[in-house]
Amino acid sequence: MARSAGFLLSITSLPSPYGIGTIGKEARKFADFLKKSGQTIWQILPVGPTSYGDSPYQSFSTYAGNPYLIDLDTLCEEGLLTKEEVMSRDWGSDDAEVDYEKIYNNRFEVLKIAYDNFKKGDQKAFTSFKRKNSSWLKNYALYMAVKKSFDMVSWTEWPDEEIKMRDEAAVKRYERKLKDDVDFWKFVQFKFYEQWESFRAYVNGLGIKILGDMPIYVAMDSADTWANPELFQLYDDGDPIAVAGCPPDYFSATGQLWGNPLYDWDYLEATDYEWWFERIKAASKLYDITRIDHFRAFASYYSIPYPAENAINGEWVEGPRIKFFNMMEEALGKIDIVAEDLGTLTPDVTELMEQTGYPGMKVLEFAFDSGEENDYLPHKYTENCVVYTGTHDNDTVMGWLETAKPEDVNYARSYCQMPDDEPFNWGLIRVAYESKADTAIVPMQDILGLGKEARMNIPSTLGGNWVWRLDGAALTDELADKLKTMSEKSGRLED
């Protein structure tokens, strides 16, 4: 595998006059900056529609795209919106942070205007899109329309028992009753995928690959669980039997209770993992490389009986292991996958990583707190891995510098052989690029030397996450030249 490098930046973090980044011209500008910097990978966060808490890892659908990412300027150019209709809205006043409440209150109203105008024109491409994507689109659009009619509560709380349990007659009744709204949600997906195709073609045309992110679990509040309850460990009334999380560890005495429903792997195996393979196939239409979050759950997953207040009483249960990936390769051919294998790795996870041959992840921020034996130190790497300075779940490098123990910071400086005049973030970036890892990825916050105010997410907290936005003025030619030189010196520049 050729040595390569790239940046991690959520699309939501791009500059935009409409409060949140989109797949419009600023996304193309950022791709141009990657090219100028000698990078060949743009890693992004999941792009599904987000729910309460705004986490891209809790989505209403594993297939649908986030309506927030649709570029409104493009809709104006198509005559579906006027500039005035877009600019008269309050998208938030802070260019450094996304105001999700304001986005939520305005974005769908504006998209509804676009939809009403769209209905007057040619529907041919839309009809074709609906037909090609009906396997997931019908369920998703109806789910969102019914959800909206019930004040956006999850399907497990819908007051109409018949539609909650997907009674056939009730499904038909709601499809008729909410027809226009159902079609609106289909239109939104049509525009997302139309724009995504154009965005991806532009990025790929520059020789840059999109490294996308797939959460392993689906949200309880999703079209997936509502439409396919048999795939999950659910009771007949829709309540989960057990939910996902992580056991207590050094960082948390009570563990992490994520609350996602767990897969019924016996059922999935009996159906030749068809749902999963369709999901992975759909991801490869969006991305060139797919990172699978919490990969270890394919070896064994943590099961917490429902309901629970914390993760203390869970147990490890065997996952589908290598059989799943062998069958996947038979069904889909070779798919480029990065396995998120962070945390404590048990022998079954190590074995699965070796069997699949997927590159795992190494994070430099984890490397300097336990001396020479730490597996995240670069001299321990093999070529077949992706090295990061940090991820969306960690503090920025400069934020880490402020809070780390002095002895850990001193060890990092000494190990990385940082001269006194080298800024700490650049020392870590240099070491990542010079490491033997095939791929090096750096979050934009670390390239810009930003502190904890630019951290993307603090796990197990609600509010104030996923809001950081990039200042476009920071992407200078001087910075691009510096990064390109670093790529060249470390053998990561494409010929």
What kind of feature is each model-predicted range?
Residues 26-50, 286-287:
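Catalytic domains of carbohydrate-active enzymes, especially glycoside hydrolases
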Residues 35, 196-204, 329, 353-354:
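Surface-exposed amphipathic alpha-helices with a cationic face
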Residues 45, 209-211, 215, 289, ...:
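Outer-envelope exported proteins of Gram-negative bacteria
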Residues 25-32, 194-202, 277-278, 424-428:
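Short alpha-helical segments and helix-capping/turn motifs at coil-helix boundaries
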Residues 185-218:
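Conserved, well-ordered alpha-helix/loop/beta-strand core segments that scaffold catalytic motifs
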Residues 1-25, 29-32, 36-37:
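Mature N-terminal, pre-catalytic/accessory segment of carbohydrate-active enzymes
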Residues 2, 10, 16, 54-193, ...:
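Alpha-amylase-like alpha-glycosidases and glucanotransferases acting on alpha-linked glucans and related
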